[in-house]
A protein has these predicted regions:
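Conserved beta-strand-loop-alpha-helix junction that forms the acyl-donor binding cleft
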Residues: 117-128, 146-150
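Acetyl-CoA-dependent GNAT
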Residues: 9-78, 82, 87, 100-101, ...
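Conserved GNAT acetyl-CoA-binding A-motif
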Residues: 107-120
């Protein structure tokens, strides 16, 4: 992938029709399965990301897809962050932070009062957890269809 270090980042809604975006979704799923035990992965595949109530965005730098993230409307003015993944060529460049801020802004604009997320446990998840906690997310109870296990954790942000 050709990176463009001086190009500005642009975040836009994505319909997952771009093969590069599809590849990043696959990379995300592979990463989740590689770092979590069977039955403990709740990441959405492409069909799950295309369902009603789910909005997907990509962060682009130049012509490259630098990251992906989604917001799932759970009803009751609550949203769930799904499928946050930065392409390996763009790590530590603020991609995930920009996507997270975008989701928070959109959630507020849609009248949501809370954002929640489920993520894994262990060293592979520490960078993401640090990002969420820096932004004000706090540990909390399981939500929606999730059940607490030793392999997952839940974070929430009141908007």
């Amino acid at each position: 992938m050709r990176t463009m270090p001086d190009a500005p980042m642009e975040i836009r809604e994505d319909d997952l029709s771009c093969p590069v975006t599809q590849d990043l979704v696959r990379l995300h799923l592979e990463g989740m399965h590689a770092t979590s035990p069977p039955g403990s992965v709740f990441a959405l595949d492409q069909s799950g990301l295309r369902t009603a109530g789910v909005t997907v965005w990509t962060a682009r730098i130049g012509d490259a897809v630098a990251g992906i993230a989604a917001l799932k409307d759970l009803g009751d003015r609550t949203g769930e962050i799904k499928s946050m993944r930065t392409h390996p060529a763009f790590l530590r460049r603020g991609v995930a932070a920009a996507l997270l801020e975008h989701i928070i802004e959109v959630a507020r604009a849609r009248g949501m009062t809370r954002l929640s997320l489920e993520t894994g446990s262990g060293a592979a998840f520490e960078p993401a957890l640090a990002l969420y906690r820096r932004r004000g997310f706090v540990d909390g109870e399981a939500f929606a269809q999730y059940v607490r296990s030793p392999f997952n954790q839940f974070l929430h942000l009141d908007l």
